[in-house]
Amino acid sequence: MAVSAALGEDRLYDDQRVVAIDFMEVQPRDIRRYITPDGRNPFAEWLSSLRDLNAVVKIEQRLDRVRLGNLGNSKSVGEGVCELKVDFWPGYRVYFGQFGSTIVLILCGGDKSSQEQDIRKAKEYWKEYEERENAN
């Protein structure tokens, strides 16, 4: 069965049938980085500690895709925090919280070996951030 699609159209032609496709609208996101009450940026500190510049580039490229609206391989890890997987050895992760559908707050990063403690730290950061925002 031959299937073809024309760019910019929302229909696929499957032999003699026309099938309508419901495309999801991609929503660009504003990325912000969490700053602790004492002025530290945990994500920037982690990123600058990486010795592999290729890893830094891969992580920044992954965040660029998030800016364009593509969360890709990500999942909730609970308490409002999500994990964004970066497809690069040794299994880098970026942890974030999200406000609505357009604002992403980058909390911290890590890799597979430190995943459990990174998730705990990200949850602490998210909780502190929400409390600080609600107090204002």
Which residue stretches match the model-derived regions?
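Short beta-strand motif preference
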Residues: R93-G97
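Basic, Lys/Arg-enriched alpha-helical interface segments
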Residues: M1-P90, G100-V104, D111-N136
